[in-house]
Amino acid sequence: ITELANEYGLDVVTVPSGLQPRAALGFSFSLILIMLKRLGFVQSETVTMVENSIEPLETLVSELNRSENPALTIAEQIHNTCPIIYGSEDLTWVSAVRFRGQLAENAKMLSFHHHFPEQNHNEIEGWTMNSDIMSRFSIIWLKDEEDHPGTQARMKISSTLLESAAGCQLDISQTGENRVERLLKLIHFTDWVSYYAALLNNVDPTPVNRIQELKLRISIAV
C-alpha cells in the first residue's frame, strides 16, 4: 500500500513496527488526530490540549513507576476478582472499554464493562442472584469531574445499592486542565493497573498466546 501511495504521490503515515497494537496507542492516536484535523473534523484547540497533556502524562509515569503507587494498590485490590468496570457515557466509557481490553491482554483477566446511565436500565437487576459468585466481583467506577450531575447521582446511588453484592468497590479518576488531559491520564493510569495485575498474576503481559493460536487456526480453516 505504501508503494502504491508513493506511486500516486499520496501522503503516507506509518506507525513504527514491532509494537503490540495496544502498546502503540500514542502513535496511532496522534496520527489519526492529525489526519482528522487536516480534514477539518477536529479543531486546533483539541490538538493543543493533547500536546499540553504530554508533560502531565510524563509526571504520571514517574509516579506510577515507583515501588509503591496507586495503580499497584488498585491491582492488589482487584487481584483474584472479576472486575466489573463502569464508566459514564459523557467521557469515561472510552477508558472502560480500553481498560477491559488491557486486563484481558496484559493480565489475562476476564472483566466486563458497561456505562451509565444505561446500566441502570437493565444490568443493575443482574446483581440480584448468584451472591456466592458476585462476592468474587470487584466494581471499578471510572469517574470524571465533568460527568453529568444526573450520571454522578446515578453512580453514587448505584454504588450504595451494590455495596453488599460486590466483593469490593473502587473509584478511579484523574485531575487535569481539561477533559482531554484527564481522559488520557485515566487511560494511562488503568494501563498501569493492568500491568501490575499481570505481575501479581505471575504472567508476562507481552505475549497474547490465545490470540495467536486463534489466528493460526483461522488461517488454516479459511
Residue spans for each PLM region:
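A SIS-like phosphosugar-recognition module
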Residues: 1-8, 13-222
